[in-house]
Amino acid sequence: MLKFTAIAALAAISLSAPAFAAGDVVAGEKIFGKCKACHAIIGDDGTVIQKGGKVGPNLYGVVGRPLASYPDFKYGDGIKAAAAKGLIWDEAMLTAYVVDPTKWLDENSGDPKAKSKMAFKLATGAEDVVAYLASLKPAMPAP
């Protein structure tokens, strides 16, 4: 009986834990330092989570957000073409994008000549950065 109770407790804990990308959130926060030259993370209430540049869009809540949807940001044609397909950023898609943005656009925009405005490629640590970004979600509205 004790064994069953322990297994049931572990199952309940694992089911209640938030599901993030396969990466390491703490490592991703550190690696995000490479992204701050172009990107900031600013909460919906204006709280600055990561001070950074404005060359790229704010990355708060990016996981789960439709592509090219951050207000008033001037996206390139390639990412807008991919967005027209109704794509939503998920962990796997965002990881592939930050590893090689132009290759990702080539595969997902329908335009083999599409170029990304994001020239930086995150060769290592992409899953960690995406796990970090996925952990920064807007609060759910109260019922």
Language model: regions and residue ranges:
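Bacterial N-terminal signal peptides that target proteins for export
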Residues: 1-8
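Bacterial N-terminal signal peptides
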Residues: 8-16
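Sec/Tat signal peptide C-region and signal peptidase I cleavage site
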Residues: 17-22
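Periplasmic/extracellular electron-transfer cofactor-ligation site
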Residues: 23-87, 101-112, 137-143
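An amphipathic alpha-helix signature
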Residues: 56, 60, 91-99, 130, ...
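Short, solvent-exposed loop/helix junctions and linker helices
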Residues: 87-91, 123
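Surface-exposed aromatic
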Residues: 112-119
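Short, exposed beta-strand-loop hairpins at the edges of beta-sheets
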Residues: 120-124, 128-136
